[in-house]
Amino acid sequence: MIEFRYFIPVFSLFVCLLTFFRFGTILNPICIVALWWSFWLFVANLSLTGLFIPGVHTQVLILTMIFSMLCGGILAKRRAGFHGKNILRNNLQLHKKWRYLYFILGFLIPVVSYYFVKAIRLFFSEGILGYRDAVFGDVDRPSVLFGSNYLELLYALLFSPIIHVSLLASIVFYLCFQDRRFLAVSVVLVIMDAVMRLGRFNFYYFVFFLFISYLFIRQRSRVRDPIGNGFRAAIKNVRVTIGALALCMVLILSVLSVMRSENSDNIANLLKRFAVEYHTVGFVLFDESLENPTSRLNQEISYGRSLLGGIDTIAVILLRRIDRNLQSISNENSPLMREFQVVGWDYDGYPILYNAFYTILYSMYLDGRELFFFAIPFLYGYFLSTRYQDWIGTGEIGTLMVLNMLTYTGIFSIFQSPVEGTIFWVTLLLLFLFNRIRILRRIQPVEAL
């Protein structure tokens, strides 16, 4: 695979140049997502930790996906904008409207606190590693934390998306309006949710949303208009706080990693696992399924159900009243993805075992084979680019939230497929519901308001 080691840097340079000429900066979401995937594919070719190097077919599919996304982003044009004074007023109204989420979070905090305290108690009775194995339920065994598959499902369908969208929105409103209370409540919920499931990605999400929101707001602040001037003044006051928050989240992430690890793991092994293997093992898992002619990936095709997995799950829940034998695509995929696979050999000659991290590549190939590696990334790049251009052109905070969510999808798809879960789709629904009234009101004449 030496050829890919040389080709990927050249390809990445091509992406940077093309997006720079299109958007005037390489720090645009198309380039960020493309370089993210290209960088980790390059690292995968180095096999730094003993993981197998992905095959030619897999690497060609990934590069095709990146190129198709690039084409969609380059060809996209921004929609017609609105007058600056209307946008400024709408941003203020949107901030007030999102404060209604406080009431919803007020109901969430007691429930999440209850399960948080229960999780702490179970840590001491079950042990950290024992709790980690039992916290997620399945069809045959309910979660030790929730005690019921229905309660766990309710939490996944309602509570997790609300926590997710509150994190996304509170960071934006903190950077734009210094709304510390909204951010504090969201951070507390994120920490409790992460600890009770021993999940580290919540903190990764926080650092990402903080960075990407600051980056995009800073870019919009360079536009010389009333909105840009307001953003420029706002972000000057939060730079130190941003650094402190990011550092705290990294420290908590490190502590949770130590808690979840085996006693024999040292800091170097933890860093190697989280910084390298977690970001590249998905290529190997997908490659092994792709090259196995008897795997489900090669024996079946799901015609779009996998990429609409969250919607599919909700639909199956409703339709089970008619046919109790119905299974969602995520339930069909889960048993196979939970099986550990040998993905390499460490320096001591022991096999490296991983599961779950199949990336969005698995969903796309299962849905539509090679065709979907052209079509889906093109559409994704197109919508990502239009949201970015809309944001730079208008400065609408609602557009920024959707832009952040789409960028998040492109970045974290390297681990698992966000669209196959319910959090992504319910979060989009919540964004739509909170922004819809504002959209309807802004088209009214100014004199009528």
Region roles according to the model:
Residues 11-118:
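A structural signal for hydrophobic alpha-helical transmembrane segments in multi-pass membrane proteins
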Residues 134-153, 247-380:
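Small-residue-enriched transmembrane helix-hairpin modules in multi-pass membrane proteins
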Residues 30-39, 182-192, 244, 378-381, ...:
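Central hydrophobic cores of alpha-helical transmembrane segments
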Residues 5-13, 108-112, 155-169, 354, ...:
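Hydrophobic alpha-helical transmembrane segments
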Residues 353-449:
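Hydrophobic alpha-helical segments
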Residues 23-29, 171-184, 388-399:
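Membrane-interface helix-loop-helix junctions at transmembrane boundaries of multi-pass membrane enzymes
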Residues 81-239, 246-260, 445-449:
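Membrane-embedded catalytic interface detector for glycan/lipid assembly enzymes
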Residues 8-12, 61-68, 160-170, 201-217, ...:
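Hydrophobic core segments of transmembrane alpha-helices in multi-pass, intramembrane catalytic enzymes
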